[in-house]
Amino acid sequence: NIFASIVTILINAMKKNLFYAQSGGVTAVINATAGPVITEAKKFPKQINKVYAGRNGILGALNEELIDTSKESKAFIESLQFRPGGVFGSCRYKLKSIEENLGEYQRLIEVFKAHDIGYFLYNGGNDSADTAFKVSQISQKMDYPLTCIAIPKTVDNDLAVTDSCPGFGSVAKYVATSVQEASLDVQSMRESSTKVFIMEVMGRHAGWIAASGALARQNKNDAPHIILLPELMFDQKKFLDTVKHTVAKLGFCVVVASEGIRNKKGKFIAESDTRDAFGHAQLGGVAPFLANLVSSKLNLKNHWAVADYLQRSARHLASDTDLQHAQAVGKFAVRYAMQGMNGVCLLYTSPSPRDKTV
């Protein structure tokens, strides 16, 4: 009995807690990643004691606001796959370099030590992956054993190497569906009312979301008739000529524009003077800018819409493939952590990405 008790004590001493946090803009399926992280962790009772979630992302660690997920019901955890948004709260907070703000990293390790956390899973985009890597570095310098893994999430689909990123598929489906439905509306009213419809979508540097509007096309003359990508310089004259020609030919024109399109000088055409927590220029206003051009230069009645939060929170229209990917990265993040992988980010790849469906 004494021996068994000693063994139990030693095993419990080896067990560590896992800290999971969500970061950046949320998606229709990010909670579908959180659920598998929690359930998969339970399959490793000898290595993992509890799963803590950060309240409002990494701020939950810095402010020592940890959510003990073991207190949540099984029904609640299972329901996460159906909930859009970030159930534990997210944040836009970028840790500076270790040299610039060593104290913040030391604070993280201090909190992790206090709560016996040995695994850190950070669910976000490029900046979040960078943060996870930096934390893995500082933990080694501070001689604190901590396994750090970045779990991919971004609607922009701009993470390197990966074929597709959890969050994108659902936005692509929403945008394509919305464009198709809105175009039928405009087509119905073209004779005596609206001639041009402009839909602004997310995508600062990557045009994946805007390009997904093309999925609405089934025939040659179907909308969208114009797609504006951030990778290509915006040519005002060419844009107006194409709108004019399309309206003359079809009676209406539908445009899908990325928020990140730039002018000839390389500046965002909708850039404001403010910046977000990551230092990125705040964008927004591409659609009204284009609408004003159409009104003033072509004198055509038009309407515009900004998909904004709607595109990334539309769980009712989520992609099943996207959902499966989101669940898989959560599950495998835990498995890879148990295998000792550290300072890495999960990526989804396939031999034939074009065979995959949204």
Predicted regions and their residues:
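Accessory alpha-helical/coil subdomains and C-terminal extensions
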Residues: 122-124, 130-139, 165-303
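Glycine-rich oxoanion-binding loops at beta->alpha junctions
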Residues: 65-117, 127
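Short glycine-rich or small-residue beta-strand-to-loop segments that form or flank ligand, phosphate
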Residues: 17-27, 87-92, 118-124, 150, ...
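Short, ordered loop/turn segments at secondary-structure junctions
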Residues: 23-25, 54-59, 92-93, 125-126, ...
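C-terminal catalytic subdomain
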Residues: 277, 282-289, 295-346
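Single conserved hydrophobic/aromatic residue that forms the stacking wall/gate
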Residues: 348-358
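N-terminal phosphate-binding or glycine-rich loops at protein starts, especially the Walker A/P-loop
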Residues: 15-65
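A glycine- and small-aliphatic-rich helix-loop capping segment at beta-alpha/alpha-beta transitions
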Residues: 35-43, 67-73, 134-147, 165-170, ...
